[in-house]
């Protein structure tokens, strides 16, 4: 699977659940993205990637077979476990073929359990 960068997730979204005094932390995130694709020959995967003191981690949010040309809404809830200081969190698209042409129409990331407010979620129209 080839990983393609979609977006950084701002610290204001994941930072509250990152460990402070304890060494470990955990949080769940609602993630959704509307993806357009052309020339796909295999699956597409929406993924959350984060880096912490234990290394790099990758969680699959959702996937689709995605043959040919079209679009797909990929969405789900992902649980992220943090170890020590968190460096970054990103949204990635996994593609099986380097020839796939893709674009993101919309992206949504929100930590579960937070009040509905603009500062608590990443909503992007590309």
Can you annotate each of these PLM segments?
Residues 1-126:
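Extracellular and organelle-lumenal recognition/adhesion modules and their flexible linkers in secreted
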């Amino acid at each position: 699977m080839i990983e393609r960068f979609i977006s950084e997730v701002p610290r204001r979204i994941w930072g509250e659940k990152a460990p402070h005094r304890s060494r470990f932390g955990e949080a769940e995130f609602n993630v959704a993205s509307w993806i357009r694709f052309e020339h796909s020959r295999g699956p597409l995967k929406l993924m959350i990637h984060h880096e912490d003191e234990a290394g790099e981690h990758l969680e699959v949010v959702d996937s689709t077979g995605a043959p040919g040309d079209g679009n797909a809404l990929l969405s789900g809830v992902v649980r992220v476990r943090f170890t020590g200081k968190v460096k970054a969190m990103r949204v990635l698209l996994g593609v099986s073929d380097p020839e796939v042409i893709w674009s993101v129409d919309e992206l949504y990331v929100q930590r579960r359990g937070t009040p509905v407010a603009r500062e608590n979620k990443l909503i992007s129209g590309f």
